[in-house]
């Protein structure tokens, strides 16, 4: 026998199911107006898990009027064929289906993605204009139209005439050339472009003077030697000359013996005076 608590719980479940299902009540109330309704349900799903599990709740309703009490067994046998086909329907998961359909529709109705190309960053090249450097003017230096630099200096020994020193690639080189020339001409009184480099100019000037002095000494020696050679040559030439015979009486004998005596009178006149140039023989 089942306990009264279990019976009450089963009755509550059956009552809730019957009250919710209006179609089931309309079908069975017409046949059992004055009879006692006994409902029994067996779950097919519970039979697969637990074969022996089944419940047969009974509900006896007393009718007041015309019908008599019917036995439970006769009612169950009559309605067994109808109850066998009855099964609880499973409620489909509407939320999952809706979500999947919404996903599909939203994916289909979704607008195609736009391919937006990122523009390439353009590097702006800024032209930096350098400020023109101040051109320093050097003493004795002039710039030619084609870019070269010319160096000139005035020679005080020649009444200030310009002396050409040459052309240079840079103004500094031309200025140094002017400083060298100014130091050579004026010495320590010269006004130069680079005063700190005067000591270098002194050394260069001294190195240039030494070979000049040596060369001058060599030239003096060479001239002395040449003069001595000339004197010696003249002396040798005089010695090599044949001495002439003097006009003495001893030398006259040879002349008389050799000829008719006319050779002596063919001697040119020795007097510087023209009046006595000719000798008259008497």
Swiss-Prot record:
Molecular function per GO: DNA-binding transcription factor activity; transcription cis-regulatory region binding
Keywords recorded for this protein, A-Z: Activator, DNA-binding, Ethylene signaling pathway, Nucleus, Plant defense, Transcription, Transcription regulation
Keyword Repeat listed: no
Cysteines engaged in disulfide bonds, as pairs: none
Domain of life of the organism encoding this protein: Eukaryota
Entry GO terms, CC: nucleus
GO biological process: one example: defense response
Ranges annotated as DNA-binding: 137-195
Induction behaviour: Induced by ethylene.
Compartments reported by the entry: Nucleus
Main location group: nucleus
Tissues where this protein is expressed: Expressed in roots, mostly in root tip and lateral root tips.
A Pfam family it matches: AP2
Gene3D superfamilies in the record: AP2/ERF domain (3.30.730.10)
Family: Belongs to the ethylene-response factor family. Class 3 subfamily.
Domain notes: The AP2/ERF domain binds specifically to the 5'-GCCGCC-3' motif. The affinity of this binding is higher if the seventh amino-acid of this domain is basic.
Role summary: Transcription factor that binds to the GCC-box pathogenesis-related promoter element. Involved in the regulation of gene expression by stress factors and by components of stress signal transduction pathways. Probably acts as a transcriptional activator.
Protein known as: Ethylene-responsive transcription factor 5
Origin organism lineage: Eukaryota, Viridiplantae, Streptophyta, Embryophyta, Tracheophyta
Gene, per the UniProt record: ERF5
């Amino acid at each position: 026998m089942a306990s009264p608590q279990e019976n009450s719980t089963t009755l509550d479940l059956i009552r809730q199911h019957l009250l919710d299902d209006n179609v089931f009540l309309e079908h069975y109330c017409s046949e059992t107006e004055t009879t006692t309704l006994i409902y029994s349900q067996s779950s097919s799903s519970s039979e697969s898990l637990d074969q022996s599990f089944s419940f047969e709740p009974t509900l006896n309703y007393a009718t007041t009027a015309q019908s008599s009490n019917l036995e439970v067994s006769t009612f169950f046998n009559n309605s067994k064929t109808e109850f066998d086909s009855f099964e609880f329907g499973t409620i489909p998961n509407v939320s999952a289906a809706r979500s999947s359909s919404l996903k599909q529709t939203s994916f289909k109705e979704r607008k195609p993605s736009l391919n937006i190309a990122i523009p390439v960053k353009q590097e702006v090249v800024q032209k930096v204009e350098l400020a023109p450097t101040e051109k320093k003017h050097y003493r004795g230096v002039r710039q030619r139209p084609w870019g070269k630099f010319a160096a000139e200096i005035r020679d005080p020994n020649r009444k200030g005439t310009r002396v050409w020193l040459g052309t240079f690639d840079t103004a500094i080189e031309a200025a140094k050339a002017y400083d060298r020339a100014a130091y050579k001409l004026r010495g320590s009184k010269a006004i130069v472009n680079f005063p700190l480099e005067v000591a270098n100019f002194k050394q260069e000037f001294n190195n240039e003077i030494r070979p000049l002095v040596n060369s001058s000494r060599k030239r003096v020696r060479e001239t002395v030697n040449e003069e001595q050679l000339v004197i010696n040559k003249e002396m040798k030439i005089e010695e090599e000359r044949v001495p002439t015979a003097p006009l003495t009486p001893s030398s006259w004998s040879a002349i008389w013996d050799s000829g008719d005596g006319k050779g002596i009178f063919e001697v040119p006149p020795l007097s510087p005076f023209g009046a006595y140039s000719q000798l008259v023989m008497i």
